[in-house]
């Protein structure tokens, strides 16, 4: 039997968290980010919202499947790892778009990448291949986004009067 309130919370936390980050940085995307030198393989801006929404929903559903197997008490370690990577995910947006700190955004994303692997590894014994099916696209996208972040860092030197490593 589906625990509807738990499912709704598990889905809404990542999706709404991502939406808040997106709305909070919309001005920077149209201003600062638009002025950056970008690689030919940079996706169009309109693609980020739908991709992240799907990924957030998938990870939320994966967390629900784990939660369903005994709640926080029984699944404390996998859910703690998941929550930690989600916090790092949410932290990346202000590091990159608000503070313009490519260096800190890269460190954040590297730690997040490792924690996504740990999330998959700890979810898999609980929910089987659902963990791979739901979270592997997220890992692939974060790998791509990490490469993009590093490319932007290397190819967009800080402007005079702006602090950036």
Predicted regions and their residues:
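Membrane-interface loop-to-helix entry segments
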Residues: 43-57, 100-112
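Hydrophobic alpha-helical segments of small multi-pass membrane proteins
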Residues: 79-92, 106-119, 135-142
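N-terminal signal-anchor transmembrane alpha helix
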Residues: 1-24
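Helix-adjacent hinge/juxtasegments
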Residues: 57-97
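Cytosolic, membrane-interface loops and tails of multi-pass inner-membrane proteins
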Residues: 24-44, 152-165
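Membrane-helix boundary connector in multi-pass membrane proteins
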Residues: 96-101, 117-133
